[in-house]
């Protein structure tokens, strides 16, 4: 394990030095950057192909898990989704409404709910914060938020402010901890959830998988448990996206 960590650290140092060397090469760095850009595009296509067939593999793995753990696993997933949905509904209806009242009083509350439905529906149907961004910015403007504030806060929030994802990370950690009867403190659960959400939020493709891998690694579980978290991510995707999108809207209002 020590040798493996040392090797990873050495590779990281090599790529940092390589990046600095490219940056210092000025005009001659363009061919290298073009090669790296092309390689990045190929890798992204490769990941897309894998993710296209991933549902088949996940279905087979889920069937295997049910065979091993029995109905308790299915009940665990159902319970996780139900509790997560209740938490999302509480934040969506109660917490965000309180923010709207604090910011604008009764008129702010009315104006908020008059315009928040379109981005919510878009988020629910697309499961994509990026796809919901244009209609989200437009809704924020109708709430009285200036275009400068709404465009900047919502654009940044799409990458770095994800209420639904953070809550989802907490539930993923709690599910694993209960499944394997592991003792983990509340502080550690919250810390890992924040790191798993914020540190990989700018990753354009495969960010969710990286987040789940980070959770597993920090908890000390084997990578074979990754599909377990992937299934949770799939079933909570829609409500999580709604919370991510509307959280950015109320942030721009604030």
For the regions a language model picked out, list residue spans one by one.
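Membrane-water interface of transmembrane alpha-helices in multipass transporters/channels
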Residues: 71-79, 106-114, 182-190, 221-228
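Transmembrane alpha-helical segments of multi-pass membrane transport proteins and ion-pumping complexes
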Residues: 11-15, 20, 24, 53-56, ...
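Juxtamembrane helix-boundary/capping and inter-helix hinge elements in multi-pass membrane proteins
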Residues: 25-30, 38, 69, 105-108, ...
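Small-residue-enriched core segments of transmembrane alpha-helices in multipass membrane transport
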Residues: 40, 78-95, 113-120, 187-200, ...
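Transmembrane alpha-helical segments and their short flanking loops
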Residues: 170-254
